[in-house]
């Protein structure tokens, strides 16, 4: 019978996703076939499974921690906000529809049977499942139709561990208040608490822990310190909180424009891990002044973010950077914005809109969504400063609802190899300083990333660095560091005991 445990939080961004990854790593290290599961995820960071299905990035990196390939069953429902009130609904890896919050809340009960079937299929293949909730289980206005917190725990008949973030303050009130707002049968499922992101001497917490255990009857299983572990974040909360705001100087300064609807900012984790690079997410046009490379990232609302670029003055700042001969890269939505024209008769109804005019491309939005993993080769017609990247093999994935065509004579950036065919992708500007592509995950390819960075170093008169960071090994070390820290600070033996004690047959 499958062992299972669910991590729920007192709020969003308390560290559930990272701790789930840590448990997946620990169980994997202990020889258990383990998989993560989150019934419903709301995030703009998504990725593609080997069979071309779209799912949340959090469950992808949790699967990596467990030593397995991502499977869309690990995240059957993905909600991708397109505005403050509307979200694209992705079911089992494919776009189903778009809904506002009220409509989706009414629709959720229809999904319960499908969620349970998916969960049961995973339970039949794995020895341990680590479930993740969303936000807080104490959202009493959503309780009656819940499918991701206590509603999911009930379906899976699994115990719950509550995660609380002490760094934001009020941790004991958050624990007590969350438990107080749960129904008795829900509260009975909570078998432990983990206090996360602690800075300081844990002895100072001892009396508080004793009191909260006495008040609630729920044991505190551990206090996790604030860890400097480089793992992916689930959504834009970390960007808003300034987690990625770096002030230290590095040889290469890369400015990623922080679009209002930024998507897949995990593209730049591999860049940020490089020893000679500072990656900044910027909204102030003046912040582009010192950049050695400007990146327009992916977007879930290309035309809305293009409008913001102009209204905020960022488009003018990008043009000024171009005049200073600063290289410019657009990825996915950012690539679309760099073109001459965007024709949208599908999403916004805005019709034909001018792009930034940097690349000689025209984009037509379409109903069909391209979702695929691809292998690719860099073109041989790259500009001199990027010549070391010519012919290199890279890999990544595509997620976009649109097709971009180049003008005749405008060179592509990549040759994509998919379904037995070679397809041109991306574009390069006439001056060789601006380029775009639909390929996400490009910087995970070590040789390309080092070639790009050495090209930027050359432009600054700096000597190249010979060795490339092996990003896959780097991530593995981060997973192992996380697991080591959790074994040190959390009673993992008690978590095993909780899981074994509450093994129940699925309904």
Swiss-Prot record:
Biological or metabolic pathway of the protein: Cofactor biosynthesis; adenosylcobalamin biosynthesis
Key word Lipid biosynthesis present: no
What's the stated role of this polypeptide?
Catalyzes amidations at positions B, D, E, and G on adenosylcobyrinic A,C-diamide. NH(2) groups are provided by glutamine, and one molecule of ATP is hydrogenolyzed for each amidation.
Q: Which GO terms describe its biological process?
A: cobalamin biosynthetic process
Molecular-function GO terms, alphabetical = ABC-type vitamin B12 transporter activity; catalytic activity
Family according to the record: Belongs to the CobB/CobQ family. CobQ subfamily.
- Residues in the signal sequence: none
What Pfam families does its record include? CbiA, GATase_3
Q: Which UniProt keywords apply?
A: Cobalamin biosynthesis, Glutamine amidotransferase
Q: What is the lineage of its organism?
A: Bacteria, Pseudomonadati, Pseudomonadota, Gammaproteobacteria, Enterobacterales
The protein's name in its UniProt record: Cobyric acid synthase
From the record, give the transmembrane residue ranges: none
**Residues in GATase cobBQ-type domain copies:** 251-448
**What's the superkingdom here?**
Bacteria
* Keyword Ion transport among record annotations: no
Q: Which residues form the active site?
A: 332, 440
**Chain's gene name:** cobQ
List, alphabetically, the InterPro entries matched.
Class_I_gatase-like, CobQ/CobB/MinD/ParA_Nub-bd_dom, CobQ_GATase1, CobQ_N, CobQ_synth, GATase_3, P-loop_NTPase
């Amino acid at each position: 019978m499958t062992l299972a445990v669910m991590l729920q939080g007192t709020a969003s961004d308390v560290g559930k996703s990272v701790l789930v990854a840590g448990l997946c790593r620990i169980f994997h290290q202990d020889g258990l076939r383990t998989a993560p599961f989150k019934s419903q995820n709301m995030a703009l960071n998504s990725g593609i499974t080997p069979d071309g299905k779209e799912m949340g990035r959090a469950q992808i990196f949790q699967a990596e921690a467990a030593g397995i390939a991502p499977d869309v069953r690990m995240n059957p429902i993905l909600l991708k906000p397109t505005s403050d009130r509307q979200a694209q609904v992705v079911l089992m890896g494919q776009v189903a529809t778009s809904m506002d919050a009220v409509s989706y809340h009414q629709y959720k009960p229809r999904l319960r049977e499908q969620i349970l079937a998916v969960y049961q299929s995973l339970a039949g293949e794995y020895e341990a499942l680590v479930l993740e909730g969303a936000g807080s289980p104490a959202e009493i206005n959503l309780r009656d139709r819940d499918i991701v917190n206590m509603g999911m725990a009930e379906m899976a008949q699994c115990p719950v561990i509550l995660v609380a973030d002490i760094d934001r303050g009020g941790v004991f009130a958050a624990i007590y208040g969350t438990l107080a707002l749960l129904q008795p049968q829900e509260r009975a499922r909570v078998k432990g608490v983990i206090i996360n992101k602690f800075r300081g001497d844990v002895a100072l917490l001892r009396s508080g822990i004793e009191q909260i255990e006495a008040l609630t009857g729920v044991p505190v299983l551990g206090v996790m310190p604030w860890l400097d572990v480089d793992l992916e974040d689930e959504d834009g909360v970390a960007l808003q909180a300034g987690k990625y705001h770096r002030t230290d100087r590095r040889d290469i300064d890369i400015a990623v424009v922080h679009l209002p609807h930024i998507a897949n900012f995990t593209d730049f984790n591999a860049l940020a891990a490089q020893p000679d690079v500072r990656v900044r997410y910027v909204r102030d046009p003046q912040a582009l002044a010192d950049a050695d490379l400007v990146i327009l990232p992916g977007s879930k609302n290309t035309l809305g973010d293009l409008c913001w670029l102009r209204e905020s003055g960022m488009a003018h700042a990008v043009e000024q950077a171009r005049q200073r001969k600063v290289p410019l890269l657009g990825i996915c939505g950012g690539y679309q914005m760099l073109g001459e024209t965007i024709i949208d008769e599908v999403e916004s109804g805005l019709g034909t809109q001018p792009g930034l005019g940097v690349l000689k491309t025209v984009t037509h939005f379409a109903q069909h969504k391209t979702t695929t993993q691809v292998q690719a080769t860099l073109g041989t017609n790259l500009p001199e400063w990027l010549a070391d990247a010519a012919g290199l093999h890279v890999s990544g994935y595509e997620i976009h609802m649109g097709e971009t065509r180049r003008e005749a004579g405008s060179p592509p950036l990549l040759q994509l190899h998919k379904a037995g065919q070679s397809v041109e992708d991306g574009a390069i500007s006439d001056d060789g300083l601006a380029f775009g592509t639909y390929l996400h995950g490009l910087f995970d390819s070590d040789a390309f990333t080092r070639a790009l960075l050495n090209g930027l170093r050359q432009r600054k008169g700096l000597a190249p660095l010979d060795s490339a960071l092996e990003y896959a090994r780097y991530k593995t070390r981060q997973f192992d560091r996380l697991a080591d820290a959790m074994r040190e600070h959390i009673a993992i033996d008690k978590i095993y005991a909780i899981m074994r004690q509450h093994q129940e047959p699925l309904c």
